[in-house]
Amino acid sequence: MSAKAVLAIDFGTVNTYFCKCPGDKISPVGVDFGKNRDGLATAILYRKGSTALIGDTALEEYGDATNDDRNTYVLRTQFKPEIVGSKQARDDAVEFLKGVLEEARQQNLALSPTERKVIIGVPSESDSTFRKTVTEVAKEAGYGEVRTVDEPKGALLNHVSHGDIPATDALKGVLVVDFGGGTCDFAFMYRGVVRHSWGDMALGGRLFDDMFFRWFLDENPEAYRRMVDNGDEFFVHWCLCREMKEKFSRTMTRDRSEAFKKAVGEYGRLTEATWDGFVSRAKAY
């Protein structure tokens, strides 16, 4: 009897990725949900009287909605790090993962978790409570009995399979650093086994999202009240400012002497943001 096919899930704070692999050979294939890229945004949009939307579609719908529409919408993102201590975050995670299965059915993507061995990556420094909660969330969402795997193992295997690092070097001892959207995970691996891990389940890229939000408000102090009145504070804080952070990063990668500018919806602009200004704010954050 051939080995059972695998469905692997990288359930991230900002983006979530799905990968299918036959049971008899190592040939993983990422799942494209229609955006010409693997994965989708970890987001869910609850709509009064309508089916919830997930992924990039949820963010786009909220971004394009009128103020009247937004009064009937609830957008949730970045809930993964809070699933242990927050019932709301746990419920959002369940509904998001349910929504992925429904989206896959509608697009005939055949995730078929009940017919596959399902594994979900978790930060190596995560404790047993977090891992247990992840498996419970997945089971409640319809994925069956799920096994968790330390994310650094998947990261290292990916780099070895793509030729980024020789397998012989990978076995000697490797430090894997995963600075994700919600967590910061360090793992020292020897012969493919995590020997030591450390980091923080609360530190990650979302701290920079918040820093850029504060930077924007320093330059546009009148914007906050208008955001709150329009019900936009969450969307601007965690979505638009994340986009601004990512664009700033690309700009600085190209040329750190360049001054960065970015409009944030109808609420104003970040102007003349510099690398030195970023470093100064990051040190003081």
Go through each PLM region and give its residues.
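Phosphate/ATP-binding catalytic cores across multiple sugar-kinase/actin-like superfamilies
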Residues: 93-111, 152-167, 281-285
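Helical "lid/coupling" subdomains associated with nucleotide-phosphate turnover
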Residues: 218, 250-285
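Hydrophobic, small-residue-rich alpha-helical packing segments that form membrane-like cores
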Residues: 134, 141-164, 168-173
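Gly/Thr-rich phosphate-binding beta-strand-loop-beta motif of the actin/hexokinase/Hsp70
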Residues: 2-29, 163-195
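Phosphate-binding loop and its immediate beta->loop->alpha context
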Residues: 23-141, 211-212, 217-262
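Conserved A3 ("GATE") glycine/threonine-rich loop of ANL adenylate-forming enzymes
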Residues: 11-15, 151-155, 182-183, 204-210
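Short beta-alpha connecting loops at secondary-structure transitions
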Residues: 194-202, 223-227
